[in-house]
Amino acid sequence: VSSSPTPETTDVTPEDKLRILIGCDTFAPDVNGAARFAERLAAGLVQRGHDVHIMAPSKRHRLSGAFVETIEGEQMTVHRIPSFRWYPHDWLRFVLPWRAKPYARRVLDLVQPDVLHLQSHIVIGRGLAIEGAKRKIRIVATNHVMPENVLDFTLLPERAKRLFVRWGWRQADLILRKAAAVTTPTRRAADFLERSTHRRGVLPVSCGLRASDYTAVVGARDENRIVFVGRVTLEKEIHVILHAMTRLDPKLNVSFTVVGDGDQRKNLEKLATELGLADRVHFTGRVSDEELRRHLTEASMFVIASIAELQSIATMEAMASGLPIIAADAMALPHLVHHGENGFLFQASNDRELADAMNTVFEMSPAEYETMQRASLEAVQAHDIDRTLDVFEGLYRGVPSA
């Protein structure tokens, strides 16, 4: 890994400034919740005057080294580690596991961080945790991963998948035990992690977002537009939304926009055609941040049927856009959606319940609809990125979370 000039920072005193190394198995240009959180966290820390370094897979195998990159409008040093494409997945790249520790040693020698913040325990995070612990560097770990989330890309036979999940949680436990503090995005995710490992005292710390970056138009809509934002993969259960659409009154003329891309796109486009929905369902593929926000602003509601969300930044983005949320009653989504207040929950995979919930929103009076919009806007304030940054700064310094 070669060196590169460190971006200049301002407005901090030397005693307050920290050199932070964030270890990620997924980072820009990847589009997913874990990568987006790491980007916002890193940019927010740079804005506060800290010296932030990222260790992440290279964008292409030969494009390795240390580069000054602009992330969320802020410059920081990103140490790109030689990686390979995992072809069963539509974008995933990975560092060879047996090379993780040597690469970690090299980056640690170069950066000399005050603290490590791991965003994954699988490859890069594992290497950093093992080598960082040897050097007695303070480690904070955030878990974004459920082994269940990666089952579809392992190519394992069905009967081996249960063993893989058990093995995955054991490996997570071995790495997370090296951290002085372990966090997850929500209380439900923290409880789940504690049940699945021997970790205790896991702290719920929201991924956070800056609500002012999103535009909410409060008021009834002229068109009935459903939107989903996220990876187009199996665990997102987008097919449930398509089946629910067939149960809606055709007079409502409901359209559905899927913002994002993934390995299930062709299958879902085929399903939409088979269900007679091809003219009302639009898959955008990858879009810019500006386009994503426009789709949210113009929608009537946000629908998410996913069964494996540890928080869901996309749902928070929809809330910041003033949308009622219809979400599966699974994992951490009930943490964001308060049934009957800023949206409705439905039994996971139950397209009939989902259709009923969507109908309820479409049939609301303008006043009822606006009340639900304002409830989303109010609820998302608890997830302000500055609160998240405050907590992590404290954890980096060893200050207990309030």
Locations of regions flagged by a protein language model:
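Short hydrophobic beta-strand element within catalytic cores of glycosyltransferases
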Residues: 324-327
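A conserved mid-protein helix/loop that constitutes part of the nucleotide-sugar donor-binding site
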Residues: 36, 224-247, 252, 256, ...
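Donor nucleotide-sugar binding/catalytic pocket of nucleotide-sugar-dependent glycosyltransferases
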Residues: 56, 162-216
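N-terminal subdomain of nucleotide-sugar transferases
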Residues: 2-69, 74-80, 387
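A short, well-ordered alpha-helix in the C-terminal region of glycosyltransferases
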Residues: 367-382, 394
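Aromatic "clamp/platform" in nucleotide-sugar-dependent glycosyltransferases that forms part
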Residues: 307
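Conserved acidic donor-binding segment of nucleotide-sugar-dependent glycosyltransferases
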Residues: 339-340, 344-351, 360-366
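Short alpha-helical donor nucleotide-sugar binding micro-motif in glycosyltransferases
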Residues: 108, 176, 286-287, 294-299
